[in-house]
Curated annotation (Swiss-Prot):
Cofactor: Zn(2+)
Family annotation (NCBIfam families): alaS
Pfam family, one: DHHA1
Domain of life: Bacteria
The protein's name in its UniProt record: Alanine--tRNA ligase
Binding-site residues, Zn(2+): 568, 572, 670, 674
HAMAP family: Ala_tRNA_synth_B (MF_00036_B)
GO CC annotation, single: cytosol
Swiss-Prot/TrEMBL catalytic activity: tRNA(Ala) + L-alanine + ATP = L-alanyl-tRNA(Ala) + AMP + diphosphate
One MF annotation (Gene Ontology) recorded for this entry: zinc ion binding
Summary of the function given for this chain in its UniProt record: Catalyzes the attachment of alanine to tRNA(Ala) in a two-step reaction: alanine is first activated by ATP to form Ala-AMP and then transferred to the acceptor end of tRNA(Ala). Also edits incorrectly charged Ser-tRNA(Ala) and Gly-tRNA(Ala) via its editing domain.
Length: 881
């Protein structure tokens, strides 16, 4: 029987019993803030149970789409690890709203299972709430189930509640006995005594009698009612004779589709875990989007994003490095579209949303995953079992890597994440952002002057032609208020009618300088321009009192201005050189020009090679040595563009613009201050090159004396290196190359010796294999310090054993390294390398973990290495089944 046929038979059966077939409600619960998603069939009838709503029927039956991911009912982390758990599933149900109660519910369930589905009655067991004598008797009376197949259980298992509050009541679960061949090793393997795959819950009958309030108090519902839920996928697995829900016709086609995309064959064991996750998540993503949820950062949208990105990550584990999940939407629709037309109607939209989210996530994942793997490797080496909050926050803040994804990946490797530390780092960032906002507020305060200065004329800037001038104080400000004077030691702002001080703009920092007047003076700490063009000087009065109307002398800090102009002119040279070397696609994306150095951001698709960096540096220095004239002119914007001047993308320009021209080499629109000729820059040195965003690179550089100092430092370092190599400086490179070649040859010889030694060591180690519960186990201390070599040795030993468990330990620099390997057949017998090594490493004050077949760990106590290895035998004995 197919899954679709099962759904149809269920609905028709209950329709024949007077039930109204009600279509599935949305996965977004209507008017119910207590639930993230619809997670059971009764959700759409909650108000009916509470007596707040009435329907034109007292009996209903549904096939309800459900999601359990997030909130109290969250199966996300167990999906794919078991044969039964899903984020998305269908719940078949029959409901009574004050119509029938326990007797009829039990009668209908038994009839459907044994007569319609023809399940063998002797395979069916039931559980009842320990205090529900009525249900206990009814199962014997109606179904003839003997008392030994009716198990009383406690509130945890047999008292159902939808959430922390709301309708609830005792329940009775119908269990299908899959047979002793599926039994576990528990003694006894019995319903209620173990939770293995032999005992498959297929139907839960909830006898809705109470409502639980926020204080945990129970009160009778207005009308006792029935709510039942049967897992469609579970019953389909029984009817189709398969071991897992993932093997049913409801999900198996999705696994086949993943096989086709990956070119890999599905393994129903642990190796097939990624296939099962992807198949499940494709279903939940499709249905969530069909019900109007889009990926985002809050609430349901965040859960969808997490599910989608989790599937994408497992696709990467299968070797898929491009968006693929959207391609499974067609398969979901082919299976489910008949029963749920909403997914078929939105098929194209669903696929598009998934693809766009996959594209965004691949950008995040590729960078963040590399960093996280490095963090986990360091933690293993250090014997840590915890990823620090700062490490997790760096992943989140710098790489956009979600905390829950960090926790999930870390957990798979046997690590925990310090969530409290993460929250502290997040709080610290918020505080930094708040402080930054305070700084911005201070700047905005200066901008706010514009509204308070409407009564005064603008400021004339005279600094292109002179560094000293005289002006009149037009206005003074202190602590956000306009004042008439500033006394000695006061800090405030002054607006003059004219000034030679350049106001911050175009990436160039504002000038500093000095004000003098009769009987007083002040330091100019910064200069800024207001939106209306007026120029504000931030000053500190060092002597006397400055009053409105005072005549003052203004002098710019010459040395600082010259250094800034040097870096600004060279920024133009750099821009042109980058275009010449890399291509005309290069455009300025930002800059910072200070007296100390320059920073230039530009559009480019890849990091610069060493050759490109040398070419850029050489070209800029050539133009400096050429002593090219730097000239400026003011013209209209249109004429400047016609002349070929470079304008910054996104920058707003007025009708009149200033053009800075460096001979025939460079011509840009710019309001900054510049040199008279390029030779005044002295020299140019690149300091760094890096990426700051998608398609944006950043270089930092120095000029003049700073570039000379950098060259002198390089020369000194070369002399030091040459001294260590005992050769003249001009022979240092040749000597290093010779040493590198010699080192390669030594490494080749060492590798050969290691292989020979490893073969010898392996033969010796194999003599020390012990048998534990019929399992060959080799715990051994080895003299291997490199973790990669340790893994390789363990792999070779496992290969030679064929079937067995290898646990190797070594010590180096006061630390311990462990590696464990388990053959495939023993993984199936319950031995898990990650769990094994986690316990072993604790003996040596360490931790770690990993997969079932391979794991690594570290420790801090080398003195406990032998004890830890000996303990591994006990752990293996406890795991094997």
């Amino acid at each position: 029987m197919t899954g679709n046929e099962l759904r149809e038979r269920f609905l028709k059966f209950f329709a024949s019993k007077g039930h109204t077939i009600v279509h599935s409600s949305s996965l977004v619960p209507a008017n119910d803030p207590t639930l993230l998603f619809t997670n059971a069939g009764m959700v759409q009838f909650k108000d009916v149970y509470l007596g707040l709503d009435r329907r034109p029927f007292t009996r209903a039956t549904t096939a309800q789409k459900c999601v359990r991911a997030g909130g109290k009912h969250n199966d996300l982390d167990t999906v794919g690890r078991t044969a039964r758990h899903h984020t998305f599933f269908e719940m078949l149900g029959n409901f009574s709203f004050g119509d029938y109660f326990k007797r009829e519910a039990i009668t209908y369930a038994w009839e459907f299972l044994t007569r319609v589905l023809e399940l063998p009655p002797e395979r069916l067991w039931v559980t009842v709430y320990q205090e529900d004598d009525e249900a206990y008797q009814l199962w014997q009376e109606i179904a003839g189930i003997p008392a030994e197949r009716i198990v009383r259980m406690g509130e945890k298992d047999n008292f159902w509640a939808m959430g922390d509050t709301g309708p609830c009541g005792p329940c009775s679960e119908i269990i299908y006995d899959r047979g002793p061949e599926h039994a576990c090793s528990s003694t006894p393997c019995a319903l209620g005594a173990c939770d293995c795959d032999r005992w498959l819950e297929i139907w839960n009958l909830v006898f809705m009698q109470y409502e639980r309030d926020s204080n945990g108090n129970l009160s009778p519902l207005p009308r006792p009612s029935i709510d039942t839920g049967m897992g469609l996928e579970r019953v389909a697995s029984v009817l189709q004779g398969v071991d897992s829900n993932f093997d049913t016709d409801l999900i198996a086609p999705l696994i086949k589709a993943v096989e086709k995309i990956t070119g890999r064959t599905y393994d129903p064991g642990e190796a097939g875990f990624p296939f099962r996750v992807i198949a499940d998540h494709a279903r939940s993503c499709t249905f969530l989007i069909a019900d109007g949820i889009l990926p985002g950062n809050e609430g349901r949208s965040y859960v969808l994003r997490r599910i989608l990105r989790r599937a994408a990550r497992f696709g990467k584990a299968l070797g898929i490095d491009e968006p693929f999940l959207y391609r499974l939407v067609d398969t979901v629709v082919a299976i489910m579209g008949g029963a749920y037309p909403e997914v078929a109607e939105q098929q194209e939209h669903i696929a598009r949303v998934i693809e766009q989210e996959e594209i965004r996530f691949h950008e995040t994942l590729n960078d963040g995953l590399k960093v996280l793997n490095g963090i986990l490797e360091r933690a293993r080496q250090e014997g840590r079992e915890v990823v620090s909050g700062l490490e997790a926050f760096t992943l989140y803040d710098t790489y956009g890597f979600p905390l829950d994804l960090t926790e999930e990946i870390a957990g798979e490797g046997g690590f925990k994440v310090d969530r409290d530390g993460f929250e502290k780092a997040m709080a610290a960032q918020r505080e930094r952002a708040r402080a930054a906002r305070e700084d911005v507020k201070a700047y905005d305060f200066a901008l706010a002057f514009a509204g308070a200065l409407e009564d005064i004329s603008g400021t004339a800037f005279t600094g292109y032609d002179q560094l000293e001038d005289k002006g009149t104080v037009l206005a003074l400000f202190q602590e956000g208020a306009r004042v008439t004077s500033l006394e000695a030691n006061a800090t405030g702002y002054v607006v003059l009618d004219r000034t030679p001080c350049y106001p911050e703009g175009g990436g160039q920092v504002g000038d500093r300088g000095e004000l003098k007047w009769s009987g007083g003076q002040a330091r100019v700490e910064d200069t800024r321009r207001l939106p209306d063009g007026k120029i504000v000087h931030q000053i500190n009065v060092t002597a006397g009192t400055l009053v409105v109307g005072q005549e003052v002398e203004i002098a710019v800090d010459r040395e600082r201005r010259q250094a800034t102009a040097r870096n600004h002119t060279v920024t133009h040279l750099l821009h042109r050189a980058l275009k010449n070397i890399l291509g005309e696609h290069v455009n300025q994306a930002g800059s910072l020009v200070t007296p100390e150095r320059l920073r230039f951001d530009f559009t480019h698709f890849a990091p610069l090679t060493g050759e490109e960096l040398r070419a850029v540096e050489a070209e800029v220095n050539q133009k400096i040595l050429a002593n090219l004239p730097v000239t400026t002119l003011e013209t209209s914007y249109q004429e400047a563009k016609a002349m070929g001047a470079t304008a910054l993308f996104g920058e707003k320009y007025g009708e009149r613009v200033r053009v800075v021209k460096i001979d025939a080499y460079s011509m840009e629109l710019c309001g900054g201050t510049h040199l008279g000729s390029t030779s005044e820059a002295g020299s140019f040195r690149l300091v760094s090159e890096s990426g700051i965003g998608a398609g944006v690179r950043r270089v930092e550089a120095v000029t003049g004396a700073a570039a000379l100092e950098m060259a002198l430092q390089d020369r000194q370092e070369l002399a030091t290196i040459a001294g260590l190599l005992k050769v003249p400086p001009d022979q240092a490179i040749q000597r290093v190359r010779h040493l590198l070649e010699q080192n390669k040859e030594n490494e080749r010889e060492l590798a050969q010796l290691r292989n020979e030694l490893a073969s010898y060591t392996i033969d010796k180690l194999l003599d020390r294999v012990q048998e534990v519960a019929g399992v060959p186990v080799l715990p051994a201390r080895v003299q291997i310090t490199d973790p990669e070599a340790l893994r390789e040795m363990a792999e070779r030993l496992r290969s030679r054993l064929g079937s067995g468990v290898v646990i190797l330990g070594s010590q180096h620099n006061g630390r311990v390294n462990f590696v464990a390997m388990v053959s495939k057949d023993l993984v199936q017998r319950g031995i898990h390398a990650g769990n094994l090594l986690r316990e072993v490493a604790r003996i040596a004050s360490g931790g770690g973990g990993g997969r079932a077949d391979m794991a690594q760990a570290g420790g801090k106590d080398p003195g406990k290495l032998d004890q830890a290895l000996a303990y591994s035998l006990k752990v293996v004995a406890a795991q094997v089944r």
